[in-house]
């Protein structure tokens, strides 16, 4: 009970609501945690309190903590570990706390998929699945689906008298392909798998079309649309009421009033019918008749008011006309006939989906693979069984988990789906009033509906639970925001109090939902939120595409100007670490976009202004010239009859034909493919002037034949390396600008092929299809780049990527871009509640029209899209800590402002439903909201009017401005002073310096650098160099300590007889340890075969291969450490890293400025992840035996001391990047098979 909960300690940092969330117990608890409210800290504190509870302590492995990402799970473990270590400092003798620390790595703190995997691994025998299964690659999964579906459809086409199937094909495919039908089957399969019982959902979908003995009033689609009809009639009626008010003004068109009142009476009739039934509305719509407006002499009245009255009435009439045409032009029974006609076709479609699901599951089972939806469904299958009434109930395994888990805690609960909810339900107590489920989230930040997240689960509980938790679950609101300034919070509240409601938005933005100030900031200048609306220029080329390009350019230019001005002026932001204000830096800025198409243009504009910028574009890899050329080579190897790829290869540096030579070749055979023409040309004797062309083509033709033969017999990865080597293309691109990057791109292609070969597919043709599917899904890979915390750049990212992050200054751009409604335009629509909806198509009569189900689903999806976009906007606005700047571009600002002002004097906080539901972009919500605030008066010059005081005078500060696009694109004027200097230079005259700045020029010329000490130390160091800095002078000549890596190259002839150097031998051994296949047996024969392969791939020279002592490599894998490598969960080898390190740590003699950092780079030989943590291994090939009189025991402390700094830096790099401690650091010496565990 509540009275038994621990009281909040005196002076506690926790708010009352946070403390309640930490200690509340005895029932299911839902914590609605607003942005920046410290939910993770609360969650960690709750777990700690449970673990160290004096009366009833809970072991950490008796808690199930479900997070949204693996990174969040690791962060949670780290925080819990740090908190337990602090407790241990106060209670060093506590065996319980020590036990919890030892249990932490085994605790169930993970994503839902990791928990599912744990359940499946433990109870795989209850499923028809190989316990050695692997997680399928997404593209591999797509290709498997394609294969299975092709086989099913081919069978169906081959069945005689398959009438219903061919009816399905006629209705939903084109003359050219059945792609649309395939998309339907796959979409239905995917949607069904988002439900706990996929088959049951599919059956309900068919049942909805069985209308035998039903009237239209019985249909769920009609019931939903009837609510929408009421909404639209109400909107239209509001237009007439507004028109009537205007007509009644002193200079309004009074003769219009009689007609407008008749219109109101008509809407009264229609609305009454809508409250009765569909049939009533249908009949009322047939009798709609509009009175003709009386003629008036417009000069007798205010012309603007007359126009407004007439426009409002026309809008109302258009709303009714739209309803008549869409819904009430057909008799109710005709809609029922559509359902009857489509029922058998839909039944066949669902049957195909079920067959597909069954065969797809079987194929995955045969290949020993599962996907992420399988993990959820397999877990659910283990945790549930069917009751007598056909419903799902907990299985014996589920009951075991219920007994095991004292509490289940779910983070980001708003992003849970139906299947995940069922899994959680089966491992927690049944009763909400006595439950053990603790859920944390913010439904206002639920932005993953496209991943089938279901915010309705959160909303349902939020409405059902009470703050007292009496008779059911308890809800706790964490509304205090500890992230942002008052100006950001009040600005966000002001907008969302007006746009987010239950009818439109799915959530009431009431007093409980409002953000409340929790952070304290010093007084700041220019902290008001801003809305900058850009008026596009008048002349736009290239239609809509050109307009989009210009919008991006305008917004980028404006943001660049603002960022530069803020940095140059020393705009200050608060630094919590120093508890003081400091000048803003580039890394304090972020530009948020709904999606990334504008990002390249924004980056380009910022770079032109000298602003460092970064965006993870994740595109461009396959567009890179070197990758594109190689992909064309592989397309030609697969099928040389493809003209475009072959022409591209012939024209590339690989063959090197110029345009004239290509034309000459084509002239030799105007018919047939390029390949046929090339083959024919090579058979004849060339003319003298064609000899060079002949030689080029003959060289390439012979290579191509060899590659095609090799591709049929050898692995794809070997083929790729063979092509790289025989063409010399890999070395060629290395000599081009950005050569290292180009070679890295080619290595990535090789790695992709290796990954592909690890799947169930083989062969070049399928690999090319594999890549095509990656591109079709839009999964092109960008160049990887790791950003350090200290990198001073402006970041550009999507709003989705920004979730959970915070920045001092936030620009939200592209607010005038239209919402993406493409999903609503599809030929068929799917919905979790309403099932399937498509056009009615009669191929015989060649007619098609919209059905009732399609209209209902489209309307429902539109309202859900509106709600999702509101939540996305909320996430964007709540990322800002100190300054929020909103930017959008419109084509005609005057016209848009008229529209936005339409609801300005609305008497309630919440804007009218039709204004919010009718929005096509974010500006359609933001601008009407801000135009009701006093801070927009300088722009509007309209006065308060009848806007309520609490809205007009709301405690928030805004700057609202319309920016002329022409001024942004105009070139910047050259300053007069600069112009004079330029003129003097052009005429080769002496530059005038008799000015106020003469002394400044002298001072600059005589200036000495303040931090001269820093110039004598390098800003970038390798780990090896730092290690040498720490070595004493006496020991610096011990060559056996030094570890050198050299590039792989053949030794010059004059050195051949001298044998390999120590460094070259070390490099060779390291190369073998990097590339040895750990999945194969480690034997002499296998290793020798792999070393030979490395020589073929030019990873080793012949000389190096001969020097490798294979038995020493085997000795390592026979050692305890080597066996741990083979048994590890994961093994990473030759891991490069860079990190920032305090200069004092790198240089013992550092005398420079405190706080300076240097960039450290290095390569970690090997790291292994085991159940209880990470171990770091560094391989050494130095000669030790015979070097020390006392043997290895004498050498050990010397070697350990010499390498301690090096391994400490490696460990620090790993811990920073992985956010996970390194448990052990090992040196392995091949000479003598020795292991040294390096301690701090």
UniProtKB/Swiss-Prot annotation:
**Which cofactors does this protein require?**
Mg(2+)
A GO molecular-function annotation: double-stranded DNA binding
Single GO biological process annotation from the record: double-strand break repair via homologous recombination
Q: Cite the InterPro entries for this sequence.
A: AddA (IPR014152), DNA_helicase_UvrD-like_C (IPR014017), DNA_helicase_UvrD/REP (IPR000212), P-loop_NTPase (IPR027417), PDDEXK-like_dom_sf (IPR011604), PDDEXK_AddAB-type (IPR038726), Restrct_endonuc-II-like (IPR011335), UvrD-like_ATP-bd (IPR014016)
Keyword Repeat among record annotations: no
Q: Does the keyword NAD apply?
A: no
Give me the Gene Ontology terms describing cellular component: cytosol; DNA helicase complex
Q: Cross-referenced Gene3D superfamilies, in alphabetical order?
A: 3.90.320.10, 6.10.250.2380, P-loop containing nucleotide triphosphate hydrolases (3.40.50.300)
Q: Name one Pfam family in it.
A: PDDEXK_1
UniProt catalytic activity:
Couples ATP hydrolysis with the unwinding of duplex DNA by translocating in the 3'-5' direction; ATP + H2O = ADP + phosphate + H(+)
- Every copy of the UvrD-like helicase ATP-binding domain together lies at 12-485
Q: What top-level branch of life does the organism fall under?
A: Bacteria
| Segments forming domain UvrD-like helicase C-terminal | 497-804
Identify the CDD domains for this entry.
SF1_C_UvrD
**Which of this chain's residues are annotated to bind ATP?**
33-40
What does the record give as EC number? 3.1.-.-, 5.6.2.4
Could you give the subunit structure recorded for this chain? Answer: Heterodimer of AddA and AddB/RexB.
Stored HAMAP family: AddA (MF_01451)
Report the sequence similarity comment from the record.
Answer: Belongs to the helicase family. AddA subfamily.
Q: What does this protein do?
A: The heterodimer acts as both an ATP-dependent DNA helicase and an ATP-dependent, dual-direction single-stranded exonuclease. Recognizes the chi site generating a DNA molecule suitable for the initiation of homologous recombination. The AddA nuclease domain is required for chi fragment generation; this subunit has the helicase and 3' -> 5' nuclease activities.
Q: What is this protein called?
A: ATP-dependent helicase/nuclease subunit A
Species of origin: Bacillus cereus (strain AH820)
Per UniProt, what is the name of the gene that codes for the protein in this document?
addA
């Amino acid at each position: 009970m509540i009275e038994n909960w621990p009281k909040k300690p005196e002076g506690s940092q926790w708010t009352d609501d946070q403390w309640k969330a930490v200690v509340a117990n005895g029932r299911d608890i839902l914590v609605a945690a607003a942005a920046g409210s410290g939910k993770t800290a609360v969650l960690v504190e709750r777990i700690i309190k449970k673990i160290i509870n004096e009366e009833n302590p809970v072991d950490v492995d008796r808690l199930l903590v479900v997070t949204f990402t693996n990174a969040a799970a690791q962060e949670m473990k780290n925080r819990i570990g740090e908190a337990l270590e602090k407790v241990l400092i106060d209670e060093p003798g506590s065996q319980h706390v020590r036990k919890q620390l030892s249990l932490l790595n085994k605790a169930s703190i993970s994503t839902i998929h990791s928990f599912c995997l744990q359940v499946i691994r433990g109870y795989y025998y209850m499923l028809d699945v190989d316990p050695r299964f692997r997680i399928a690659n997404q593209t591999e999964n797509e290709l498997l689906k394609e294969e299975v579906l092709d086989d099913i459809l081919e069978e169906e086409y081959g069945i005689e008298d398959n009438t219903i199937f061919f009816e399905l094909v006629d209705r939903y495919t084109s003359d050219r392909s059945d792609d649309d039908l395939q998309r339907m089957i796959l979409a239905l399969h995917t949607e069904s798998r988002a439900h706990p019982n996929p088959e049951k959902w599919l059956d309900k979908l068919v049942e909805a079309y069985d209308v035998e003995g039903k009237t239209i009033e019985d249909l769920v689609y009609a019931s939903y649309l009837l609510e929408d009809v009421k909404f639209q009639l109400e909107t239209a009626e509001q237009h007439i009421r507004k028109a009537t008010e205007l007509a009644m003004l002193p200079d309004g068109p009074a003769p219009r009033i009689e007609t407008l009142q008749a219109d109101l009476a008509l809407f009264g009739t229609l609305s009454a019918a809508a409250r009765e039934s569909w049939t009533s509305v249908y009949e009322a719509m047939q009798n709609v008749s509009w009175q003709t407006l009386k003629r008036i002499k417009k000069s007798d009245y205010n012309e603007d008011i007359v126009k407004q009255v007439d426009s409002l009435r026309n809008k109302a009439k258009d709303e009714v006309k739209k309803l008549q045409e869409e819904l009430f032009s057909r008799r109710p029974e005709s809609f029922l006939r559509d359902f009857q006609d489509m029922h058998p076709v839909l039944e066949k479609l669902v049957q195909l989906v079920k067959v597909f699901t069954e065969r797809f599951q079987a194929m995955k089972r045969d290949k020993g693979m599962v996907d992420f939806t399988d993990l959820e469904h397999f877990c659910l299958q283990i945790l549930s069984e069917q009751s007598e009434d056909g419903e799902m109930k907990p299985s014996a395994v589920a009951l075991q988990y219920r007994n095991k888990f004292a509490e289940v805690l779910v983070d980001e609960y708003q992003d849970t789906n139906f299947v995940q909810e069922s899994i959680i339900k089966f491992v927690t107590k049944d009763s909400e009033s006595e439950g053990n489920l603790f859920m944390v989230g913010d439904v206002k930040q639920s932005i993953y509906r496209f991943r089938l997240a279901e915010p309705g689960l959160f909303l349902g509980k939020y409405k059902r639970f009470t703050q007292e938790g009496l008779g059911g679950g308890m809800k706790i609101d964490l509304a205090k925001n500890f992230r942002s300034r008052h100006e950001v919070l009040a600005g966000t509240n002001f907008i969302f109090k007006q746009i987010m409601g239950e009818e439109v938005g799915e959530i009431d933005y009431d007093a409980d939902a409002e953000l409340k100030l929790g952070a304290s900031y010093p007084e700041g200048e220019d902290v008001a939120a801003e809305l900058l609306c850009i008026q596009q220029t008048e002349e736009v080329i290239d239609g809509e595409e050109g307009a989009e390009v210009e919008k991006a350019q305008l917004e980028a230019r404006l943001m660049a100007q603002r960022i530069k001005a803020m940095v140059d002026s020393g705009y200050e932001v608060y630094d919590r670490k120093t508890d003081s204000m400091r000048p803003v830096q580039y890394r304090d800025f972020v530009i948020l976009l709904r999606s990334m198409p504008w990002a390249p243009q924004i980056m380009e504009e910022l770079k032109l202004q000298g602003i460092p910028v970064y965006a993870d574009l994740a595109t461009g890899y396959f567009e890179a010239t070197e990758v594109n050329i190689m992909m064309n080579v592989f397309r030609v190897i697969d099928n040389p009859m493809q003209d475009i790829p072959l022409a591209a290869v012939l024209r590339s540096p690989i063959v090197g034909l110029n345009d004239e030579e290509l034309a000459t070749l084509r002239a030799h055979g105007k018919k047939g493919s390029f390949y046929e023409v090339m083959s024919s040309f090579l058979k004849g004797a060339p003319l003298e002037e064609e000899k060079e062309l002949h030689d080029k083509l003959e060289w390439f033709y012979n290579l191509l034949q060899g590659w095609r033969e090799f591709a049929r017999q050898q692995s794809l990865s070997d083929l790729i390396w063979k092509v790289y080597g025989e063409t010399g293309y890999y070395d060629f691109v290395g000599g081009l600008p950005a050569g290292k990057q180009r070679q890295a791109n080619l290595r990535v292609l090789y790695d992709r092929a290796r990954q592909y070969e690890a799947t169930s597919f083989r062969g070049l043709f399928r690999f090319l299809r594999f890549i095509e599917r990656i591109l079709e899904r839009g999964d092109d890979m960008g160049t990887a780049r790791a950003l350090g915390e200290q990198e001073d750049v402006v970041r550009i990212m999507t709003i989705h990527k920004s979730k959970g992050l915070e920045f001092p200054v936030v620009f939200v751009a592209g607010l005038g871009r239209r919402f993406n409604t493409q999903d609503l335009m599809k030929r068929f629509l799917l919905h979790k509640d309403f099932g399937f909806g498509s056009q009615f198509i009669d191929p015989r009569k060649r007619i098609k029209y919209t059905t009732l189900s399609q209209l209902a689903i489209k309307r429902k999806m539109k309202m859900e899209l509106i709600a999702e976009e509101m939540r996305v906007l909320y996430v964007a606005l709540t990322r800002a800590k100190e300054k929020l700047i909103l930017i959008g571009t419109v084509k005609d600002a005057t016209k848009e402002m008229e529209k936005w002002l339409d609801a300005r004097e609305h008497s309630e906080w919440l804007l009218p439903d039709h204004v919010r539901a009718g929005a096509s972009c974010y500006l359609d919500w933001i601008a009407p909201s801000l135009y009701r605030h006093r801070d927009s008066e300088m722009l509007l010059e309209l006065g308060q009017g009848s806007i309520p005081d609490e809205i007009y005078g709301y405690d928030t500060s805004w700057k609202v401005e319309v920016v002329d696009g022409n001024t942004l694109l105009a070139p910047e004027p050259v300053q007069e002073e600069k112009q004079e200097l330029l003129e003097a230079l052009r005429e080769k005259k002496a530059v005038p310096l008799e000015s106020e700045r003469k002394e400044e020029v002298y001072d600059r010329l005589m200036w000495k650098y303040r931090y001269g000490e820093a110039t004598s130390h390098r800003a970038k160091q390798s780990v090896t160099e730092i290690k040498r800095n720490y070595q004493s002078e006496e020991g610096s000549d011990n060559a056996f300590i030094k570890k050198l890596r050299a590039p792989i190259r053949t030794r010059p002839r004059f050195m051949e007889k001298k044998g390999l150097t120590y460094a070259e031998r070390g490099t060779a051994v390291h190369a073998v340890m990097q590339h040895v296949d750990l999945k194969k047996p480690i034997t002499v024969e296998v290793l020798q075969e792999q070393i030979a392969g490395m020589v073929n791939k030019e990873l080793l020279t012949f000389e190096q291969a001969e020097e490798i002592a294979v038995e020493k490599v085997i000795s390592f894998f026979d050692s305890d450490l080597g066996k741990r490598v083979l048994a590890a969960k994961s093994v990473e080898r030759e891991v490069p890293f860079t990190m920032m390190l305090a200069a004092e740590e790198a240089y013992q003699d550092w005398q420079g400025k405190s706080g300076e950092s240097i960039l450290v780079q290095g390569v970690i030989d090997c790291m292994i992840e085991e159940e209880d943590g990470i171990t770091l291994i560094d391989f050494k090939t130095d000669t030790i035996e015979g070097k020390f009189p006392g043997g290895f025991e004498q050498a050990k402390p010397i070697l350990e001391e010499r390498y301690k700094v090096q391994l400490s830096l490696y460990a620090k790099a790993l811990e920073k990047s992985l956010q996970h401690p390194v448990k052990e650091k090992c040196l392995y010496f091949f000479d003598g098979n020795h292991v040294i565990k390096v301690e701090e």
